[in-house]
Structure formats: structure tokens, C-alpha cells
Amino acid sequence: PVVETGSALFANFPKDHELHQGHSFAPFKDEADLAIVIRTRAPWYPPSNGPSKAVVAVIDESPHRDNMAYQSLQADLYLEGNVAQTLRDLADAVVRMGVDETAVQKRRARLSQSHDRIRQTRLEEQSEARHKTPIDPVWLCAALGKGMPDNTIYIDEVTSHTPLLRQHIDWNRPQSLFTRQGGLGQGLGLSLGIKLAKRDQPVVTLIGDGGFLYNP
């Protein structure tokens, strides 16, 4: 199963993939035997709320960030290096070791059903929000996702509604989501830069009033 945090900074995994299990690690916290944490500063909070029995492995170019005053990953293993290459190497190693294909197919079928349930719940939330006044952020995000083409790039600086944006706008391609790094006010500049780099793709910026006012 692949779980994205509610505050993911980029588009990490296609949301229409059957192994995408939403944005909460809680359902897997006590049953997982291995948790691979990829480029995540705080995968669960508080730090004591991590998996009860899993081995925790962190993969990151810089797992211990000097710019953070406090960071408590409490991992059992740190794999420092290029993330994409590390994942490829791990996948190759698993293939060489061999896996129980029957068990894999059973687990995949179970996760596919879970993926469908999560999606159905999301659709029900969107339907419920559709006729609310003023416009509900859930419906706004859903309408954007339905109305924009598949190659749209979204820029997020909404802050307080970031988790809703992650859940209700569908993106399935790499580089479909970017977020401002640092303080408020960088969203519009980031959007203009991305549009210059991706002239043939629509770029949609979602920005809160605070971020808009702070924009230089």
C-alpha cells in the first residue's frame, strides 16, 4: 500500500492506481511489518504514534535536516542517497529474492477493494458538498479536478485547506503538484516560473487570502 501524507509537497503517486490508499497511515499502523518513509519530515504525529511493530526505514537524500530545530523520525534504518535510484535498487533486490506470487495477488486484490472504497467515500463527500452555500472547498476542488485536463499543473498555497486539496483534486502524472517552500507569498511567483517552464500545460494556482496579500 502507498499512503501520501495530507501535506505532501508534490505529486508522488498516481491517485487512480489501485495501491494508492489515500492520505491516512492509521489503517496500517498496527498491521504493517515494514514502513518505508520516503522524503518525509514527519510521517506521523506525535512521533510516538508510529507503527507498533513495523521496522521503519527512511529513504531520503538528506534524512536528517540541519534546518529543522526538532526532528524525531525514530527510524530503524536510514538509506541516504538518490531516492529514485534507491527505490529502483530495492525493487530489483525484491525480484531477485523471489516473492510468493499467490500472496501478492491476494494482497493486491484486497488493496484494490480498499482503494475503491476510499474513492467512493470521496465521491460521496463531493456530492454532499455540491449544493452548499457559500461554495464548499471540497466541491471547488472536485469541480477543478473534473473540469481541467489531465496534464494540468496545480500550485498549492491554500494552507488551511491543503488536506482537502490533496484528497479532492485528482492528478495522476508526475509534476502535477507543486507547493511553495518557505513562508507565505511565494505561490504566484512559483506559478509564473512553472508556466514559463511548461508553456504547453495549464497551470492552476490555489492561494489563500493571506498568501495573496503577502505576495511580493
What function would you assign to each model-found segment?
Residues 8-17, 31, 122-130, 175-180, ...:
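Short, basic, glycine/proline-bearing loop/turn elements
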Residues 2-5, 37-38, 79-81, 154-158, ...:
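General beta-strand structural signal in soluble alpha/beta enzymes
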Residues 112-200:
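Active-site diphosphate/adenylate-binding microenvironment
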Residues 63, 160, 212:
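Short, glycine/acidic-enriched loop or turn micro-motifs at the edges of active sites
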Residues 43-47, 186-189, 212-216:
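Short glycine/serine/threonine-rich phosphate/pyrophosphate-binding segments
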Residues 4-114:
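Glycine-rich, acidic loop regions that bind phosphate or pyrophosphate groups
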Residues 28-39, 200-214:
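A short, small-residue-rich loop immediately preceding and capping a beta-strand
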